[in-house]
Amino acid sequence: MSEMTPMMRQFLEIKAEHPDAILFFRCGDFYEMFLDDAVKASRILGITLTSRNKNADGSEVPLCGVPYHSCAPYIAKLVEAGEKVAICEQAEDPKQAKGIVKREVVKVITPGLVIEDASLSPKENNYLLALCCDGECYGLSYLDLSTGEFRVTELDGLQAALAELTCIGPREIILPVSFREEPKRKEVAHVIVDRSITYFEEWVYDPDYCKRLVANQFKGATAESLGCDRLPIALLAAGAVLHYLVDTQKGHAPHVTGITPYNENEHLLLDESTRRNLELTATLSEGKRKGSLLGLMDRTVTAMGGRKLKQWINYPLMDLKKIWLRQDAIQELMEAPGTREAMKSLLAGVYDLERLNGRISLASASAKDLSALRSSLSRLPAIKEQVAACGAGLLKELNAGIDPLDELCDLISRAIVDDPPFVLRDGGIIADGYNQELDELRAISREGKGFIARLEAQEKGRTGISSLKIRYNKVFGYYIEVTKANVSAIPDDYIRRQTLANAERYITPELKEYEEKVLGAEDRIKDLEFSLFQEVREAAAAQGERIARTADRLACLDVLASLSELAHDKGYCRPEVHEGSELSITEGRHPVIDDMHSSERFVPNDTLLDNGENQLIIITGPNMAGKSTFMRQVALISLMAQMGSFVPADKALIPLVDRIFTRVGASDNLARGTSTFDGVSIAWAVAEFLHDNKMHAAKTLFATHYHELTELAVTRPGIKNFNIAVREWNERIIFLRKIVPGGASHSYGIQVARLAGLPQAVIERAKEILVNLEKGEYGEGGVPRLARGKKVPPPSPQLSLFGAGDDQIRERLKEVEVALLTPLEALNLVDELKRMI
């Protein structure tokens, strides 16, 4: 250490305090990185890795750097790669420093604590989440530092906690260090493998310590005053988040003004599998927004509205009155398209007020941010005027909550120029006429620059040197440049400052005097402008709560306008949401598939479910016929109705439900991987259980290839059979996509295999095997013959459904239900039996 330069020792001392972060070490106009940080950063950023002067021991110091005024995209790339970045600034003016400049880390940027737009997706929240537990009670809290949103809840059991965690989708997670070792809780780390994880020691979760953190952040607030007195474990998780803020942001987050507690019973519950299968916010195959329910429904024009819509989809309501209020607002905007379009046009010019407010409160906002705030606030009176014409209760309530902040808008309009520069220290931010001292300094600067122009003309005339130039650089200030060919013509009062290959540079006493006057004024202008800008930014920060409330109201208006436009354009109906049990949908459509541009017209279907004769619907039919689509569309229509949205149907009566479960697709087949007999047995028992459990009386759509299950309608009064209508033509099938009463008589496996593109030779052989099986062609020992050969009469009658023979091949073939075979299963069966013979 003693052999290192003073600056390198300073770097290592500060780096030791932040070993898990890449240290951005401010050196003049650059952030520099050294040693391992430089090696890692240069690789991630794709920038040149060089080295500083060798240490006293002869070793080189790896080095890379980025300009401080354009560091945002570099930081964003590092954070996206999962790295933490510690910003180390110069804590004093280098000109005034005695010895090495003092430096200190002002903040640590982590994946869950970014606030700059370069690191954020406009319509996605960026959550930091903390999870802890006491026995089976799990406390969960999450914060979006960019918007100030801070929520807490408690959940019963690990699976419920994991379901909520996956719904929230945090960028970074805080866990107790004990979660590293406890086998049960290692599941958490497996679920969040693509997230940045920080582990805290157990002392961070001390209740008294967490209470102090809460009181410090929220101006003496208690658990009771925050509404968290019945959520003690969630409050510990909140304490962990606040501890992280203190550690990384020096505890400076004034726009985080409160905690919003919530209970999972306030919303329709959706587990992770249901969210995934229904493709609520991302597609199942590619994980993309486009093609999901969110992708379809999002016609919002603000980033705030986009985030709010996602929350509404993830957390459908359980309160009928709130649902009706949303429906009333959507209906009024549907019936007043002029108001809706005018409102959307005005909202489209509103910037992301939530994130602007976050950066302003964190003293990270630029002059561009204040200009965006001014532009947004200037639209509020017109928005309020449009909404004031509406009579729906929710629209009136939202409009009353929009605060125009006239005085703040006026302040920014007077203080900040229309198109301010990006770099604060370059000046040109404050408008003329805002500050008298600044105006006077600018006059001096302009006069001085005019003098320079006049002096250049004067010197050209005095010397006769037409190529004479007066120029400026940061090293020498103002100087007179004369080419070598004209040096003999210079006057005696010229003082040489620098010799170049082709020119000489001079100053004169008069030039030096004016330089001091002009440059002194320009330095003072920049300092004063920055000071005035900070005053305006602080004035805006003081209105943070008002800005946040207004932003939330605007986001809700944006969502309501979006849902209204969607319902109008797609011909959706207003569902009748009620507390009864009947679910009745007339001409219902899958919202996403109905929106796809396809050569095949979407076929709507009716649905009737209740707690009486239509509690459980068994749906049979071939693969690719539309069973999964039908089930998904019923679930999505129910979910959309409880969002308060209109739904894709001609008419809909939707009961309030507390949970939706879906297991749809090949990977979620009930009894997948079992023998046919086992599968039928399990499916039969599950259907009986769902029907007979009157405590929950779950309304159920049960799609199956087990045709035996259609017999349940005979033994259970609440079970009905339906199938997907199919027409056969010329050995081919046409899917009619219509749900009709009764069970399916065939599975059409071979026809589906043809549609799936299997080779014709395979299709023909499968047909031959199927004929042999259906006609009962047997070989020696009474085994059904799959190979080509003569037919031998069967030696004994077929065993019962759940019987089994002793012979391996006989037993295997007795299990085969031909009508249920998928193309792939048929091929696998052929291969299996060939190996057994």
From Swiss-Prot:
A GO molecular-function descriptor: ATP binding
Record organism: Citrifermentans bemidjiense (strain ATCC BAA-1014 / DSM 16622 / JCM 12645 / Bem)
Function: This protein is involved in the repair of mismatches in DNA. It is possible that it carries out the mismatch recognition step. This protein has a weak ATPase activity.
Superkingdom of the organism of origin: Bacteria
Key words, A-Z: ATP-binding, DNA damage, DNA repair, DNA-binding, Nucleotide-binding
Residues annotated to bind ATP: 621-628
UniProt-listed Pfam families: MutS_I, MutS_II, MutS_III, MutS_IV, MutS_V
Gene Ontology, cellular component aspect: cytosol
Official protein name in the record: DNA mismatch repair protein MutS
Database matches in Gene3D superfamilies: 1.10.1420.10, DNA repair protein MutS, domain I, MutS, connector domain, P-loop containing nucleotide triphosphate hydrolases
